Curated annotation (Swiss-Prot):
One of its GO terms (cellular component) is cytosol. The modification N6-lipoyllysine is found at residue 63. CDD domains: GCS_H. The glycine cleavage system is composed of four proteins: P, T, L and H. Its cofactor is (R)-lipoate. This is Glycine cleavage system H protein. Gene3D superfamilies: 2.40.50.100.
């Protein structure tokens, strides 16, 4: 299982990668492994401003549906268009091509309050 050190993580198993004032968000390798084969990603919050810990969409696997939670507050700028036709990218490349949304962060401090890779690894080891 991969947990890239350059990313930040939430207790809800989302990751965040900051690139300038845009933050890419997806689910962790651990989360995709627990969910199993992803068949659909449903995000209808594009253009909305959401608070941290608010639901921004859902992800559907063969046997379950799970809410997707905002790790930071901000405006949902874009949903990954590739997931419409290839939701399995979340399984095969969760930290790259399988990103789910781009967000304009409302507060830079939110990003700093997320878990480091080491802290996230401790969380999932429990």
């Amino acid at each position: 299982m991969k947990t890239p050190a350059e990313l930040k993580y939430s207790k809800d198993h989302e990751w965040a990668r900051q690139e300038g004032d845009v933050v890419f968000i997806g689910i962790t390798d651990y989360a995709q492994g627990e969910l199993g084969e992803i068949v659909y990603v449903d995000v209808t919050t594009e253009g909305e401003t959401l608070e941290a810990d608010e639901v921004f969409g859902s992800i559907e696997a063969v046997k379950t549906v799970s809410d997707l939670m905002m790790p930071i507050a901000g405006e949902v700028l874009e949903v990954n268009p590739d997931l419409e036709e290839q939701p399995e990218l979340v399984n095969s490349d969760p930290y790259g091509a399988g990103w789910i949304i781009k967000v304009k962060a409302a507060n830079a401090a939110d990003f700093d309050n997320l878990l480091s890779a080491a802290e996230y690894e401790k969380l999932i080891a429990q």
